[in-house]
Amino acid sequence: MARTQAEPPASQPDARAAWLRDQLERANYAYYVLDQPDLPDAEYDRLFRELQQLETDHPELVTPDSPTQRVGGEAAGGFTPVVHDAPMLSLNNGFADEDIVAFDKRVADALAKATDLAGSVTDPVEYACELKFDGLAISLRYENGVFVQAATRGDGTTGEDVTENVRTIRSIPLKLKGKHVPAVLDVRGEVLMFKRDFARLNERQRAAEQREFANPRNAAAGSLRQLDSKITAQRPLSFFAYGIGVLDGMPMPDTHTALLDWYEAFGLPVNRERAVVHGAEGLLDFFRKVGEKRESLPYDIDGVVYKVNRRDEQERLGFVSRAPRFALAHKFPAQEALTKLVAIDVQVGRTGAITPVARLEPVFVGGATVTNATLHNEDEVRRKDIRIGDTVIVRRAGDVIPEVVGALLDRRPADAAEFVMPTECPVCGSKIERLPDEAIARCTGGLFCPAQRKQALWHFAQRRALDIDGLGEKIIDQLVELNLVRTPADLFNLGFATLAELDRFAEKSAQNLLDSLEKAKHTTLARFIYGLGIRHVGESTAKDLAKHFGSLTPIMDASIEELLEVNDVGPIVAESIHQFFAEEHNRTVIEQLRAPGKVTWPEGPPAPKAPQGVLAGKTVVLTGTLPNLTRDAAKEMLEAAGAKVAGSVSKKTDYVVAGAEAGSKLAKAEELGIPVLDEDGLHQLLEGNTP
């Protein structure tokens, strides 16, 4: 939504107020009518508070249509308008502890004044505390216990009729429980979507190749306001009751707590995360306790709500133009905020993953000042269309790493620059490569790159690699941080005096590690290949490479086509191996490891190539149990006939041989239309008879 009007300075209060009203009304329309919010809550709150203060300082600037004089957005087209019997007001907000102390003082003073006890000492005010859900407020009307209508808040006076959609929410009773029910009951509450349900909904959206929802609140709002209630019925919406509008035919409960207990008796869903406290100290204690468990709650909340518990005290306190005096929303530090993206750098992870990182103008969000945020990967940057110079939405929730959620396209400067993934690692200068079908680009300097140093050393020392006993993570940390070891080759240059000086490393430990290093010099080619840490090359593939080529040099010099001839090596693995050995830095470290006095292994001739048999060039997959042949025997016969026996079914598979209890491989073959043979069919195939 375009915001082209220039932002006036504070020195022009008339123009500034008009601009603020325009910004807030545009945001209201996007939020309530389009269900496409384009301003973070914190930014909206900041603009709203500024307009409130401006109108307080300059009362002549207050207009009837100012956002400060109303509750929300106008009813959208497509739904029948509903006039609320009692207005659905919003709440004033508090952010700092001082705001809560001031609220409690205002309430206590007003109650004292209302009872002609001004200046006297009174007991602390009793409050009902509950959660502030991040969903959509609605009103439910029951007549003689039967659900008859549901409406959204709208502008607080007039909302939208969403009765048919709300009927699909299973947690909302269509008839109240109990024999004694009110003639009319107007229940106020929140429609929301639990985190687990939101995740499942987006999984379905992805599977159907449909647009995913940004967050549970957007999903709940969009689902509730569907013109087709059948769509709403497929969305996992929930509801919590927390307030009341109109009540006829029964007396009003004496306290807010009693009201919620009453609702539970009627079968209405009420949240159990609530408490009764006294005074400001009790309010702040509730806020802190909820904050500690916030991330573990099964739904999103953006704060807590405090309400004077006694109904008679609520009535004495009354209302201001847009909110009750007896209640306050205590909001958590904003989890989203706006700031400017000044640059995009890349960061190298311990496994070589290249991650774009946004460098930001400092912004306070989620309780901390944020200057950097992850952009995940190159595809995410493209998908979100994030550019250098953009005004971006930054999200930080709990201990989660800050991330850039999106950019405000209407604020994009003309010179905003697209991100370009570098071709060389910023740490070591090695080539950056991205394998087909992978979202992550990686530095190929695995043995050399300082950013990957600790991971490379740890992997090299693993039991299934060179098995260097005594070289654990803490020792590796010291060796790297003291700059004693940069590559695996440096391990074999370590001396007794150097090791003995390490923290918590006695002479015996030093000698034991030296003995392990000496032992590790005599290994096998398969262990050495595995120890190099080549991506996608596990222990089994390392053995296949060693068996196929016989020595290291042919592997290092092999083309992708030659690598594809190795058993169980597919295009992605072949590309990964080829990239690793194509990087000159890796070859240098390998030569250092093979230097005299360093690592050795017995080498042999390459495995003889299978003669061109009847199945030369064919790929066969075995699955299940054959009646007379073991898996190994069948594999040996197929390989002798020139076939490649693969471990998984793909479009490149020519035949699948299936025995008893064949599983997913058989299903995959049938799905792809690949010929499936039994044991007799296998024998015919080996005899040259194509099924």
Swiss-Prot record:
Cofactor(s) the record lists: Mg(2+); Mn(2+)
GO cellular component, one term: cytosol
Domain BRCT span(s) in chain numbering: 610-691
EC code: 6.5.1.2
Keyword terms: DNA damage, DNA repair, DNA replication, Ligase, Magnesium, Manganese, Metal-binding, NAD, Zinc
Enzyme class: ligase
Pfam families: BRCT, DNA_ligase_aden, DNA_ligase_OB, DNA_ligase_ZBD, HHH_2, HHH_5, Nlig-Ia
InterPro entries: BRCT_dom (IPR001357), BRCT_dom_sf (IPR036420), DisA/LigA_HHH (IPR041663), DNA_ligase (IPR001679), DNA_ligase_AS (IPR018239), DNA_ligase_CS (IPR033136), DNAligase_adenylation (IPR013839), DNAligase_N (IPR013840)
Stored SMART domains: BRCT (SM00292), HhH1 (SM00278), LIGANc (SM00532)
Cysteine-cysteine disulfides: none
List of catalytic residues: K132 (n6-amp-lysine intermediate)
Residue positions binding NAD(+): D41, A42, E43, Y44, D45, S90, L91, E130, R153, E190, K307, K331
Record-listed Zn(2+) binding positions: C425, C428, C443, C449
NCBIfam families: dnlj (TIGR00575), PRK07956.1 (NF005932)
Function according to Swiss-Prot or TrEMBL: DNA ligase that catalyzes the formation of phosphodiester linkages between 5'-phosphoryl and 3'-hydroxyl groups in double-stranded DNA using NAD as a coenzyme and as the energy source for the reaction. It is essential for DNA replication and repair of damaged DNA.
Protein's name according to its UniProt entry: DNA ligase
Organism: Burkholderia cenocepacia (strain ATCC BAA-245 / DSM 16553 / LMG 16656 / NCTC 13227 / J2315 / CF5610)
Annotated gene: ligA
